[in-house]
Amino acid sequence: QDKCKKVYENYPVSKCQLANQCNYDCKLDKHARSGECFYDEKRNLQCICDYCEY
């Protein structure tokens, strides 16, 4: 069983529009495994940091 947590970060939309900016921020600033942008239920772009450990 792996320890897995995903943390929702509120990032400016501009960061999600730049290629992989969210991914870089999650890795460099948050020490996460990766990051990705997605639309929430209000159609706002969010950045989610993936802290899953394998």
UniProtKB/Swiss-Prot annotation:
Keywords: Antibiotic, Antimicrobial, Disulfide bond, Fungicide, Pyrrolidone carboxylic acid, Secreted, Taste-modifying protein. Disulfide bonds join 4-52, 16-37, 22-47, 26-49. Gene3D superfamilies: Knottin, scorpion toxin-like. It comes from the Eukaryota. InterPro entries: Scorpion_toxin-like_sf. It is found in: Secreted. Coiled coil: none annotated. One of its GO terms (cellular component) is extracellular region. The modification Pyrrolidone carboxylic acid is found at residue 1. GO terms for biological process: defense response to bacterium; defense response to fungus; killing of cells of another organism. The keyword Secreted applies. Taste-modifying protein; sweet-tasting. It is 2000 sweeter than sucrose on a molar basis. Monomer. Belongs to the DEFL family. This is Defensin-like protein. It comes from Pentadiplandra brazzeana. The lineage of its organism: Eukaryota, Viridiplantae, Streptophyta, Embryophyta, Tracheophyta.
